[in-house]
Amino acid sequence: MLSQIQRFGGAMFTPVLLFPFAGIVVGLAILLQNPMFVGESLTDPNSLFAQIVHIIEEGGWTVFRNMPLIFAVGLPIGLAKQAQGRACLAVMVSFLTWNYFINAMGMTWGSYFGVDFTQDAVAGSGLTMMAGIKTLDTSIIGAIIISGIVTALHNRLFDKKLPVFLGIFQGTSYVVIIAFLVMIPCAWLTLLGWPKVQMGIESLQAFLRSAGALGVWVYTFLERILIPTGLHHFIYGPFILVRQLLKAAFRCTGRSICKSSV
């Protein structure tokens, strides 16, 4: 059991290894837009230098703006027992299908689930845009769960022999067909349960902020006890704080922080 959990934790490092380079690109781009380092003339929005740096910065944000999709597609590389490339394709299609189901159910029965899908997908709304789909903001947690489900289906069904007249659906197509049916209840359960999970995460964040030394102890204990399993990412990811803000806020305000003389 422990070896399987460790294998899962190790599989998470495949997408994680994309972060260092992307972070360096974004950090350098923000630095090169700081007039304190390169001068006022080069940071003028109309200058060719500033425009090139902006273009490079936007490319650097690719990984951070698409983390759920990257985690979903990256996990089968370490978890699929065979044909890892085909498993990644099946996961990508199924992950997008799951998000489309969430969008359709939310738009149709949003009042039943207590989710307002007519609002814009902005911070605090509980919604996000994923590959052009307005869906629940399940972050990498939803991506990991869906990726795990579809990868398990791939491991079980990829080699299954079908009748000759259905041979065209054998392999990856068969996995995607079964996953399509599985994504319907998954989307339903996500709409039922995830809003409550979001409230729980917010409550835990509030506790860690306000509990002083006890909050620090709880956070550190949970992180350290999960390190042997490789699942400590679930703890420090959502809850690392910078002056009562998610650490992700630093990436959004990095430019203004660099320009500050304080």
Could you describe each region identified by the protein language model?
Residues 1-10, 158-177, 197-218:
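Hydrophobic, small-residue-rich membrane helices and short re-entrant helix-turn-helix hairpins
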Residues 21-50, 92-120, 192-220, 224-225, ...:
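Interfacial/capping segments of alpha-helical transmembrane domains
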Residues 259-262:
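Short, intrinsically disordered, charge-balanced linker/junction segments flanking boundaries
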Residues 14, 18-26, 176-187, 191:
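Hydrophobic alpha-helical transmembrane segments in multi-pass membrane proteins
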Residues 2-163, 170:
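Early transmembrane hairpin of solute transport permeases
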Residues 148-165, 181, 189-201, 233-237:
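Juxtamembrane interface elements at the cytosolic ends of transmembrane helices
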Residues 132, 136, 184, 188-191, ...:
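Generic amphipathic alpha-helical segments used as scaffolds and interaction surfaces in large
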Residues 12, 135-142, 176, 180, ...:
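Hydrophobic alpha-helical transmembrane segments
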